[in-house]
């Protein structure tokens, strides 16, 4: 059987009891290591779980999944995923491949950023579509996130923006030359995300959001050093030092907010007076 085991958001202790039992009895254990990362090293996981772990990078999962699924009809294979197993479409694809081979699949869920972001003080049922922000290049600036944010904003809902990470990625030059040389890991920050959002707004000029739109920067959600900073998008462009190391996420507030959300989020505000002024003028409105 193939087990997809969620690891939670932070460290080795976030795994569930059921998940740990699966890991301990599995014949092979893989750790998916490119859609997200834990805040501890692989060696810490291996020590806590009492098992050796094979890191499954993008190339293995997307192009060599037969190795992961090898003999899973007759033995248990554990595929570990940071957060919840179905937080990325890659994992759905792995399940479909297993089904084609008539391999039974079982999921062990866990907390993910989709639920953990509630710790910022915004009510989860006031969130709309989640969007992703990738690193822009000089020639590639995908903006599909903008239209989804627009849809959320039209009905007053918050938007969770998941920011890019680059782990074991090749440069275009190395890919073109067929060289297996990988770039150093890169993790997008809240500041970079906010800047790119404002860049696309400047290009599109549809008024979906603005420099003074309220947002929350989140770092290491669920971890011991969890951190939130609230302010305008313009303010969040310069709060990376305060937020600290990865992983980061950003939430753009919708206008249909609740007073309880204001009371909770206000404690994280960079400038409380400015936050209150914008909130009272633009937010808490029923659309």
From Swiss-Prot:
E.C. number: 2.1.1.314
Gene Ontology cellular-component annotations: cytoplasm
Gene Ontology annotations of biological process type: methylation; protein histidyl modification to diphthamide
Keywords, ordered alphabetically: Cytoplasm, Methyltransferase, S-adenosyl-L-methionine, Transferase
Family in the record: Belongs to the diphthine synthase family.
The UniProt record lists the keyword Methyltransferase: yes
The gene coding this protein: DPH5
Keyword tRNA processing in record: no
Pathway(s) per entry: Protein modification; peptidyl-diphthamide biosynthesis
Superkingdom as given in the UniProt entry: Eukaryota
Reactions accelerated catalytically: 2-[(3S)-amino-3-carboxypropyl]-L-histidyl-[translation elongation factor 2] + 4 S-adenosyl-L-methionine = diphthine methyl ester-[translation elongation factor 2] + 4 S-adenosyl-L-homocysteine + 3 H(+)
The protein's name: Diphthine methyl ester synthase
Binding site for S-adenosyl-L-methionine: 9, 84, 87, 112-113, 163, 221, 248
Membrane-crossing residue ranges in chain numbering: none
Subcellular location(s) per record: Cytoplasm
Function: S-adenosyl-L-methionine-dependent methyltransferase that catalyzes four methylations of the modified target histidine residue in translation elongation factor 2 (EF-2), to form an intermediate called diphthine methyl ester. The four successive methylation reactions represent the second step of diphthamide biosynthesis.
Single Gene Ontology MF annotation: diphthine methyl ester synthase activity
């Amino acid at each position: 059987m193939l087990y997809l085991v969620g690891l939670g958001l932070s460290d080795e202790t976030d795994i569930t009891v059921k998940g740990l039992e699966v890991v301990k009895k599995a014949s092979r254990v893989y750790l998916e290591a490119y859609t997200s990362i834990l805040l501890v090293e692989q060696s810490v996981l291996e020590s806590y779980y009492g098992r050796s772990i094979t890191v499954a990078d993008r190339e293995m999962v997307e192009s060599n999944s037969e190795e992961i699924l090898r003999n899973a009809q007759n033995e248990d294979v554990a595929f570990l995923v940071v957060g919840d197993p179905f937080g990325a479409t890659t994992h759905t694809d792995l399940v479909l491949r297993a089904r084609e081979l008539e391999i039974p699949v079982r999921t062990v869920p866990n907390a993910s950023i989709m639920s953990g972001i509630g710790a910022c003080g915004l009510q989860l049922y006031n969130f709309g579509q989640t969007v992703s922000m990738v690193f822009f290049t000089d020639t590639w600036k995908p903006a599909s996130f903008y239209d989804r944010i627009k849809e959320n904003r039209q009905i007053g809902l918050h938007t969770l923006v998941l920011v890019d990470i680059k782990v074991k990625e090749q440069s275009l030059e190395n890919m073109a030359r067929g060289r297996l040389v990988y770039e150093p890991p890169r993790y997008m920050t809240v500041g970079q995300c906010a800047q790119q959002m404002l860049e696309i707004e400047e290009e599109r000029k549809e008024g979906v959001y603005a420099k003074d739109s309220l947002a929350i920067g989140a770092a290491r959600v669920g971890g011991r050093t969890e951190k939130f900073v609230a302010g305008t998008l313009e303010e969040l462009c310069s709060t990376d030092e305060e937020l600290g190391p990865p992983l980061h996420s950003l939430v753009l507030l919708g206008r249909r907010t609740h007073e309880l959300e204001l009371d909770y989020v206000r404690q994280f505000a960079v400038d409380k007076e400015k936050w209150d002024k914008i909130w009272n003028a633009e937010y808490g409105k029923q659309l």
